Structures are given as structure tokens and as C-alpha cells.
Amino acid sequence: MPFVTIQFLEGRTDDQKKALVSEVTEVVSKNLKAPKENIHVILEEMKKTDYGVGGVRKSDI
């Protein structure tokens, strides 16, 4: 039962997230020979105020 977690910054549309879940499921199913119904995709959308790189929040760039 594969679990795939994807973290990304806010701003993607619902259609983009829907397509991402579908396409990731396809790739994992193909490569691991796992049934699609057993693949879990977890999307973790982060606010730009809650993520930083090099000491600077993304919201401050």
C-alpha cells in the first residue's frame, strides 16, 4: 500500500491538484505494479508565510 506525500506552496488550482493525484497514481501503479486503489496520495499545501528558504519566508520574497 504505497503512500506518496507531496508538499508544495499554495496557489495551485483544484484542477491542477486533481490532475497531480491522478498522474502520480498512474506512475506509481505502473512502476510498483500496485493496484491504483491501494495507492494513497497526500497533498500538503503550505502557506507562503509558513515556509522559508535561506532564512527568508516565501511570502517576503
From Swiss-Prot:
Keywords associated with the record: Isomerase
Enzyme active site: 2
Enzyme class: isomerase
GO molecular function: isomerase activity
Keyword set includes Phosphoprotein: no
Top-rank lineage group of the source organism: Bacteria
Disulfide pattern: none
Pfam families for this protein: Tautomerase
InterPro entries: 4-OT, 4-OT-like_dom, Tautomerase/MIF_sf
E.C. code: 5.3.2.-
NCBIfam families referenced in this protein's UniProt entry, alphabetically: PRK02220.1, taut
PANTHER family found in the cross-reference section: 2-HYDROXYMUCONATE TAUTOMERASE, TAUTOMERASE-RELATED
Assigned protein family: Belongs to the 4-oxalocrotonate tautomerase family.
UniProt protein name: Probable tautomerase lmo2564
Species whose genome carries this gene: Listeria monocytogenes serovar 1/2a (strain ATCC BAA-679 / EGD-e)
